[in-house]
From Swiss-Prot:
Family: Belongs to the UbiA prenyltransferase family. Protoheme IX farnesyltransferase subfamily.
Family annotation (CDD domains): PT_UbiA_Cox10
Location in or out of the cell: Cell inner membrane
Keyword Cell membrane (UniProt): yes
Membrane-spanning parts: 26-46, 48-68, 97-117, 120-140, 148-168, 174-194, 226-246, 280-300
Name of one Pfam family that matches: UbiA
Protein name: Protoheme IX farnesyltransferase 1
Role according to the record: Converts heme B (protoheme IX) to heme O by substitution of the vinyl group on carbon 2 of heme B porphyrin ring with a hydroxyethyl farnesyl side group.
First-level EC class: transferase
Keywords of the record: Cell inner membrane, Cell membrane, Heme biosynthesis, Membrane, Transferase, Transmembrane, Transmembrane helix
Domain of life from the UniProt record: Bacteria
Other information: Carbon 2 of the heme B porphyrin ring is defined according to the Fischer nomenclature.
Listed NCBIfam families: cyoE_ctaB, PRK04375.1-2
Length: 300
């Protein structure tokens, strides 16, 4: 479809359309890592105002960035089976309304962070928002097959944001959590890119399977998964976590490697999408294990 429906008509949007613009499932996973960052940062407990309004501010800014992504990608979304029913692609929300909504979310999020956390958290969150909405969505996504590697730093920021919200300063520990998500991002997205290779090619998006082929991508997924396993052990190495986390990191990472190997071998028809799905469970469970282990250590 050469001309988007969203450029011809704008049926009245309902609240669910605006909620969809925020990519709520992605935001929830980001908030989990932000919460872990907060709780790991202090032994004394996180003030409820920081816990509630700090995470709400981060969520609003993330939702604003996601809404900008919908606007910029509306033509691409209309061409892909996974995204063609999104609000802008189907014309349920206009680009102007979506941008106004994104700006409102970002301003509200920044106001909450400045009021209830600290300026450093607000600045870092703003940098993450711009990194995703402008640098990744506006440029990198269409410019290079390494788009999600370079742009992955913005999406890896939530545990750092949570840590800084609770403490007011940066340190090595939250940067290690950022590194874990940074290493996780390529195998997570490239597995999906293999599954949706034809759609990305149709939309002219230079994802790695489109530009370099599936075998090359599978090799890199395997290599990044090995790197992720190694990086995920560093919290134990630097005594940030204990044995419980170590066991969980090894078990979860081993399973991720198993899926990456199955994908590489090409022995199962749905290995790519199953690897993608497992990667989501992996990140969620890894950070939960880190949090549980932290409180076990505090009570010893």
């Amino acid at each position: 479809m050469a001309t988007l429906i969203s450029e011809r008509q704008h049926p009245q949007a309902i609240w669910r359309d605006y909620l969809e613009l925020t990519k709520p499932k992605v935001v929830v996973l980001m908030l989990i890592t932000s919460l872990v960052g907060m709780f790991l940062a202090t032994r004394a407990g996180v003030p409820w105002t920081v816990l509630v309004f700090g995470n709400l501010g981060i969520a609003l800014c993330a939702g604003g960035a996601a809404a900008v992504n919908h606007v910029v990608d509306r033509r691409i979304d209309a061409l892909m089976a996974r995204t063609h029913k999104r609000p802008l692609a189907e014309g349920r929300v206009s680009p102007r309304a979506a941008l106004a909504f994104a700006l409102l979310l970002a301003l509200a999020g920044q106001a909450l962070l400045l009021t209830f956390t600290n300026p450093l958290t607000a600045w870092l969150t703003l940098a993450s928002l711009l990194g995703y909405a402008v640098v990744y969505t506006g440029f990198l996504k269409r410019a290079t097959p390494q788009n999600i590697v370079i742009g992955g730093l913005a999406g890896a920021a939530p545990p750092l944001l949570g840590w800084v919200a609770a403490t007011g300063h940066m340190s090595a520990e939250p940067l290690l959590l950022v590194l874990i998500i940074f290493a996780w991002t390529p195998p997570h997205f490239w597995a999906l890119a293999i599954h949706r290779k034809e759609e990305y090619a149709k939309a002219d998006i230079p994802m790695l399977p489109v530009t370099h082929g599936e075998h090359y991508t599978k090799v890199h997924i395997l290599l990044y998964t090995f790197a992720l396993l190694a990086v995920s052990l560093l919290p134990y190495v630097i005594h940030m976590s204990g044995v419980l986390y170590l066991v969980c990191a090894l078990a979860l990472g081993g399973r991720f490697l198993q899926w990456a190997w199955v994908l590489y071998r090409g022995t199962r028809p749905h290995a790519a999408i199953n690897t993608f799905k497992y990667s989501i469970y992996y990140l969620f469970l890894l950070f939960i294990a880190l949090l549980v282990d932290h409180y076990l250590l505090l009570n010893l």
